[in-house]
From Swiss-Prot:
Protein name stated in the entry: UPF0598 protein F59C6.12
Protein family: Belongs to the UPF0598 family.
InterPro entries, alphabetized: DUF4505
């Protein structure tokens, strides 16, 4: 219902004065789609690395006065506004590099520093990591599955630590 409502608010590529506007969606798996695409699966996701890198580097909170409730994020590109809504967070970490020092954003080649102590898990089991945009980024399910065995839990099932090599890193509450 919300998607149908959002679609009726805009037309892809519409002009607002001299500013062209596009509308995007980020899934919980870190894939970027045109918001109004019917099929939101791997084949429909953006794969152009240069575009993804540019798009993700420019994301900020939407304070444009347009679509702020429906599209809380925006990626500005010259005279274009790329409005963004997301399943959870605007950035999603999809991969931990082989050195375990950096997390990859979506399908881009942008990495942020991995800080195990900043991991957190909500009551539904979703895992988050500190992020400069929005304060935290979702860790994609596929990566969470790989990391899950390294979490340490208290008697109530709350994650309290994360194993890095021989060391257990205490998680912040």
């Amino acid at each position: 219902m919300i998607l149908t409502f959002a679609r009726s608010l805009y037309t892809q590529g519409q002009y607002n004065g001299k500013i062209r506007e596009y509308f995007y969606y980020v899934s919980h798996n870190g894939f970027l789609f045109l918001d109004d695409s019917r099929m939101k699966n791997f084949t429909a996701a953006y794969k152009d690395i240069q575009f993804l890198n540019f798009f993700y580097r420019k994301i900020k909170e939407n304070k444009t006065g347009r679509y702020e409730d429906t599209f809380p994020w925006v990626s500005l590109c010259g005279i274009e506004r790329n409005f963004l809504r997301c399943d959870d967070t605007p950035l999603v970490y999809t991969e931990l590099d082989s050195t375990e020092k950096e997390l990859r954003i979506g399908q881009s080649t942008i990495y942020h520093s991995f800080q195990p102590s900043s991991l957190s898990m909500n009551s539904s089991g979703r895992v988050y990591h500190k992020c400069p945009i929005g304060g935290k980024a979702l860790v994609a399910d596929k990566l969470t599955d790989k990391l899950y065995r390294r979490f340490r839990f208290d008697d109530d099932g709350v994650p309290v630590g994360f194993q890095c090599g021989e060391q257990i890193i205490e998680l912040k509450k």
